[in-house]
Amino acid sequence: MLENIPSQSTMIELLGQSLFEVWQALCSAIDEKYDMERLWNTGGKNWTYEYKYRRGGKTLCCLYAKSNCIGFMIIFGKDERAKFEDIRDTLSDVVCRQYDEAKTYHDGKWVMFEPTNADEFDDYVKLLAIKRKPNRK
């Protein structure tokens, strides 16, 4: 867990104003549907920060930030991959391509999106619903 949570100005400096707005919009889209614990961490060797959504010890998704770049990761387990295939026809080509190109590990398929705008957010919400039903009315 991160001791010093980055301020809004730190995030704007890191991402740039337009990507910071995308970051905020993505967080809002998730917060609107899910009441989750949110944890800041260091971003490992590839990212500056990790912002994880989890509940009951299970991770829903993670957002990552580094200089002028946002990452949005969802890990799909075996059953969740089958559910993805069930809704594939409702998703954009961009989202399907990212999914298809993602590496599958022993614990799941790690799909990293790098949004630059809100165009795919509706699809992201559908993907999150595969992981967990929204728990906000």
Question: PLM features: residue spans?
Answer:
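Charge-dense, helix-prone N-terminal extensions
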Residues: M1-K137
